[in-house]
């Protein structure tokens, strides 16, 4: 408890400081789409939402979405160290496959929810929206503990272009080319980037990641709009480590590549009726290969695999605007999933259809609510129903109370359903599911740009899928374990005098396995009465940004991660990783504004892990030590 209370001052002090110093700058709440699929101010929603702007990403030198998510309350990002190493997100204590990931509305998760954030860069990103809490009522499977949606730039304003470049420690080098432009009728934005590094290990740790992204929007008349987004990524990561963290291989690597396409069409039929249709397609190729270190290596057997996963979906919905500013959304969705390659015996596919209903009352009123229900019909496990309800009440002045309840589910992945050979999949698996409730208070100090919010959440996860290696069972995967996660999130934001911006957050998390799986050994994932792995009990962030007029900014960010349980696969015992604090320093400075016939020039720099803190996010996998990145940007067009 003392440690918990000790973390509160960094979160609370911006509010106290700002209360003594009034500011002339009032920051408007961002408008979010992901929470209700309707443009809504974040401070009017009965759910927990964090928005990270593209401007902040660039000002703080954040290159990957995984790094950006570290500042989100309730989010635990776990990586295996080098650039390109596996990056997982545990949101509010849930599993790493409990978060739906979208890019411009296109699902990026593999069927079954898994997603590796290692190769998801912030290139050409306009903003990131993070919704915490079950959102299956709108997005179906995978949205158990939340949704992360990345929006790319849609191209507004006079035509402009930029070339960014830089390099740093670990032989890191990067280049990005962007171009955008448009008006109210049409707009475009394209980006091409490449990032590479030699890694932190002495051998076989090269990484390179190339991304092409584009967004096109059209508005042929006042009632019709259309948009298309395209993204293609190609990443290759060499790593010497085995599952225990020992660097043993000179010839081990993996490849992740594939396209993503989204199309959306909207039409306003009348003042009261709007229709929207969204089509999505994502195809991902995951490859892995290992070869002996040399002729004398008789213990490493050559192996390679290649799998293609495809998700194609169609979503149609009608927004009906009722009297009093209330909106009813009626929608239906269909998705086709396939997997083929070397992991499964042949090709497998499944379909899912769904119907959903949502009511959003006028969120500008002192008392407002959201209600939603959904019914999914899956080709494999049958029908499954989810619901969500939220309430927002403006209590007094700048104080608002929120509360919500909801359910979510996650379908099994193809391997858990269809594996053959040494591992036997279970075609009769049921989806993992959850029940969640949360309640909180939000206070905006009148006359200032200071907001403080505290939220308590409680989640129950049931029918978790667990591996049983016994030869006596018909299937190796079974719905057995259950777990609970409860916690407290405190977040504050303050803009002081227009030049200083402070954000702070603290999360307390308590997880517990309520029903263990078949494996009762020390390395088991689910042991009755034990906490879930790799989730810290305490975590906090503090970011202080200072604007240098219109010419640039400097930001210092402190990230604290408390003790968390893990497994040491060298000793085959449970372990507790120690707490650590990482401090980053970033800055940008405009040296020259673009002019006719001459580009503008800006310089950027970042020191990650400023004080060279040694730490591990996964046992035996060291994180990056102090590293420096310096770069520049040439800007063409209107400043």
PLM region descriptions:
Residues 178-180, 217-219, 530-639:
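Conserved C-terminal beta-signal and adjacent last beta-strands/turns
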Residues 169-196, 201-236, 252-274, 322-326:
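Transmembrane beta-barrel wall of Gram-negative outer-membrane proteins
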Residues 323-329, 342-459, 545:
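Structural signature of Gram-negative outer-membrane beta-barrels, strongest in the C-terminal barrel
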Residues 66, 70-107, 126:
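Extracytoplasmic beta-strand/coil segments of soluble accessory domains associated
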Residues 106-132:
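Short acidic/polar hinge/loop motifs at secondary-structure boundaries
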